[in-house]
Design a protein with these regions (language model features):
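Conserved catalytic cores of ATP-dependent inositol ring kinases
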Residues: 1, 6, 10-24, 29-31, ...
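Aromatic-rich beta-strand edge motifs centered on tyrosine
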Residues: 4-13, 24-33, 39-49, 62-70, ...
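A short local loop/turn or secondary-structure capping micro-motif enriched for an aromatic residue
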Residues: 23-25, 35-36, 49-53, 82-83, ...
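A motif-centric feature for acidic-aromatic and gly/ser/thr-rich catalytic loops and repeats
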Residues: 35, 39, 53-127, 161-163
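Beta-strand-dense domains in secreted/periplasmic systems and polymorphic toxin scaffolds
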Residues: 1, 17, 51-54, 75, ...
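Short turn/helix-capping motifs enriched in Asx and small/polar residues
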Residues: 80-97, 119-122, 127-205
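Short polybasic amphipathic segments
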Residues: 30-35, 49-54, 172-176
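A residue-level signal for beta-strand positions that form part of recognition/binding surfaces
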Residues: 24-25, 107, 123, 152
């Protein structure tokens, strides 16, 4: 049996995921440190287009290309070469067409969330809860009382193609109307045309 240990601050912020030997990561804000050596060593940190991380004694910059749900679809290295491509089933399972190399160490994938396979659990870290690839969270929604008509375990109200749940507390749509700018924007605040929004809002032909 394999055990994973997760440590959190009082406000629910994760600071350490590790195995029973203490091998894992230390989080200070969004910066991740490796605990695989005698003392914590810088591992990676996010920036606008991806992550910069340590590869041995060198630093490797990787650019993440995301889809409308924030899922990482392609990773490009600092030389502009595509190193890996991801395709997902609706609830985050890796599609067989993905060019996932065995040497690929990236753990930020579906919806941009950290995949915890290193700790022998096929779950995504959704901050407030851990999310499986079977359309369910592994624990009840702390805000379940706000949506009594929805199962407290279901992911994105059963609609993972259109909705996202970045915190594990409440699902939301990837597009919203900004009343100050008078346009629709994606989750990153970038303007999108109405046709893009309508594509995801239009009723199904079935």
């Amino acid at each position: 049996m394999t055990f994973a240990i997760f440590c959190y601050l009082w406000n629910g912020e994760k600071i350490v995921p590790a195995d029973v030997r203490g091998s894992g990561y230390l989080y200070i804000g969004s910066v991740r440190y490796s605990l695989d050596s005698a003392k914590p060593a810088f591992e990676s940190a996010p920036f606008a287009m991806g992550r910069i991380g340590r590869l041995g004694e060198e630093y490797d910059t990787r650019y993440f290309l995301n889809d409308h749900l924030g899922s990482v679809r392609t990773i490009v290295n600092q030389n502009g070469v595509v190193t890996v491509e991801y395709d997902y089933m609706p609830y985050g399972m890796q599609h067989k067409n993905s060019s996932l190399a065995t040497s690929d160490a990236n753990e930020f994938r579906y919806n941009g969330k950290e995949f915890l396979s290193r700790f022998c659990v096929d779950l995504y870290d959704s901050q407030a809860r851990l999310q499986g690839m079977n359309a369910r969270f592994n624990s009840i929604d702390p805000l379940a009382g706000d949506t009594p008509h929805v199962s407290p375990y279901v992911y994105c109200a059963g609609n993972p193609i259109f909705r996202i749940d970045p915190t594990g507390l409440a699902s939301e749509t990837p597009y919203h109307y900004n009343w100050e700018t008078g346009q629709y924007e994606d989750a990153n605040g970038h303007g999108v045309v109405w046709g893009t929004v309508w594509y995801y809002l239009k009723p199904s032909a079935n």
